Every structure is written in C-alpha cells, then in structure tokens.
Amino acid sequence: MASEAERTFHRFAVFGESSSSSKEITNKNFSKLCKDCDIMDGKAVTSTDVDIVFSKVKAKNARTINFQQFQEAMKELGQKRFKGKNPDEALQGVFKLMEGKDPATTGVTKSTTVGGVDRLTDTSKYTGTHKERFDESGKGKGIEGREETTDNSGYVSGYKGAGTYDKKNQ
C-alpha cells in the first residue's frame, strides 16, 4: 500500500513543477494532495493544519519534503483526520484515501469558444467610421481606410478648377 501512496506522492510532486525530480514535494503541491485526496476535510483537518504539519516535518531552511518526511506528515494528519485510531491505523487510512488519485485540474481556465470571435470580426456588421476601413469583401483598406489623406497638389481645398492651369496657358 505504501508503494501506491508513493506513486501518488510522485504524481503530485511533479504537478506544475517543470524542474521537479518527483523525489520531493513543495508545500503548494502537498496542500493540493491533501485537498484532492480528501485528507483535508475542512473540519478535522484544515489548510492551516496542513501548512503547520508541513513546516514541522521539513528541515529548517528547506522548501520541500521527501517521501520519508511525507510519511511523518501523513501520520500526524491521519491522527487528526481519524481520531481514536492508533498512528499506524490512521496512516493506513490516509494511504487508503490517496490510492489511485491524480492531481485534479478542475476549475482551471479553459480556452474560449470561437462564437464571440466570429461575431466580433465579421466586417459586414461594422457601422460608422469602422465600416469605412474595409471594402465590400471585408479586406482592410490600409491607411486609406484609417485617415483622411490630404491633397498636396497645391490647390486650396474645395477649388473646382484643380489641374486646369496648364490647359489655360497653352
């Protein structure tokens, strides 16, 4: 049974830790293991209890615990979770809760569906000034669609006889 608990320990140790060798588990993943395996029930064992036990079993300046320290932590949490049982029975009860469990990814942000994107990028539904930026096929006009181009011909704006000067002098 300890081997199944060890496999669960390794699965949680590498969860979300790309640099982890699965030999040691961080406090974050230890808390996740306790929560996902229903060791932390919110009444007898709370997240505070889990953090305190983790700090108690780890070395002074370490940030992780190995499997042996993990077993000590589970023994302490087991006594809190299964009151009235001796430490070995409590440990076996905790290991039974851990059997076959994997890190859960519920509540993780999913990618959005395409429906909203299609609606927002349909240029045929654009109105006002945004409509001017695209031609009938939906292709962007580029700079002509974004800003009014100035007439640099030298004539005053609104002058009707633009381009007729050379024709009059000949």
UniProtKB/Swiss-Prot annotation:
Q: Which domain of life is it from?
A: Eukaryota
Feature: compositional bias, Basic and acidic residues: 129-149
UniProt biased composition (Low complexity): 105-117
- Look up the record and report any one GO term of the cellular component aspect: cytosol
Renumbered to this chain, region (Disordered) spans: 105-170
**Tissues expressed in:** Only expressed in male reproductive organs, including testis. Expressed in elongating spermatids at stages IV-VIII of the seminiferous epithelial cycle in testis and in mature sperm in the epididymis.
> Disruption effect?
Male subfertility with a significantly decreased sperm count and motility. Sperm shows increased irregular mitochondria lacking lamellar cristae, abnormal expression of electron transfer chain molecules, lower ATP levels, decreased mitochondrial membrane potential and increased apoptotic index.
Assigned keywords, A-Z: Cell projection, Cilium, Cytoplasm, Differentiation, Flagellum, Spermatogenesis
The molecular function terms in GO held by this entry are: tubulin binding
Where's it found, cell-wise? Cytoplasm, Cytosol; Cell projection, Cilium, Flagellum
Enumerate the InterPro entries for this protein. Answer: EF-hand-dom_pair (IPR011992), TPP/p25 (IPR008907)
UniProt keyword annotation of Cytoplasm present: yes
**What is this protein's name?**
Tubulin polymerization-promoting protein family member 2
Question: Which gene is the coding source of this polypeptide chain?
Answer: Tppp2
